[in-house]
Design a protein with these regions (language model features):
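C-terminal catalytic/motor cores of large multi-domain enzyme assemblies
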Residues: 1-230
Length: 230
């Protein structure tokens, strides 16, 4: 039976109350999210993966499975196996998320001037690669067909606000973000609150880059995937 939320918990996470002194001190030593960034670059051999995808993506397959789908599944499985990766720091406190989430941005069309859409995925523990592919393909198709998909409609409305009013709105958002008052219904649409945020740069023939965190939200892991080389 799932434990009930206590005072100090959040709508998407539970506060960790057994933090050691060193880690409690670090939240004050590095008060901003971008103070604590660490970068790493890894090269993976995908030879066998490409062979597997070639056998999976037959003409009869209902949808195409890609390297990106495999990386998304791997990220979810790693967080499941290493649950400490699903923690975040906000308001100088540590929290453990209630579930694993994956966020990314998609291009509506493969063109320089094409619009973009925010995407959030909430996989189940039992998901297979086929489940991940089906979910990603379905969500992407829906987002490309609906310009008001997810948080996109709200963002389109916000962009029309006068700059002084926008500053007031952003100040209120940052305050609610810090104290855990940001509605869970909005967090579910925003990759800035995901366990892992991904960027598939290989789709535009670009190598992987070092990507910064954003100074809002609770996302602490950003994963970029570059183009596959021989």
């Amino acid at each position: 039976m799932e434990e009930e939320k206590r005072l100090g918990d959040r709508n998407d996470a539970r506060r960790i109350r057994s933090v050691d002194g060193m880690h409690a001190y670090m939240t004050h030593l590095m008060p901003h999210r971008t103070d604590a960034e660490v970068y790493i670059n890894e090269t993976l051999d995908v030879t066998e993966l490409l062979k597997f995808l070639e056998t999976r993506n037959t003409p009869e397959a209902p949808f195409k499975t890609t390297i990106f789908h495999c990386v998304v599944m791997a990220a979810a499985k790693i967080v499941k196996m290493r649950p400490l990766l699903n923690r975040y720091v906000s308001g100088n406190h540590y929290y453990m998320r209630d579930r694993i989430s994956l966020g990314f941005t998609i291009k509506r069309q493969f063109a320089d001037g094409a619009g973009e859409s925010l995407m959030m995925l909430y996989p189940e523990d039992s998901f297979t690669l086929r489940d991940f592919s089906r979910m990603i393909v379905g969500e992407v198709s829906e987002a490309r067909a609906d310009e008001a998909h997810g948080a996109d409609g709200a963002l389109e409305n916000l962009k029309h606000l006068p700059r002084p009013l926008m500053n007031v709105v952003m100040g209120a958002i940052r305050l609610m973000d810090r104290w855990g008052w940001w509605p869970e219904s909005l967090k579910r649409l925003d990759p800035n609150y995901s366990s892992v945020m991904l960027s598939n740069l290989g789709s535009i023939q670009c190598n992987a880059i070092y990507h910064h965190l954003n100074n809002i939200g609770t996302n602490g892991i950003v994963l970029t995937i570059g183009v596959a080389h021989k």
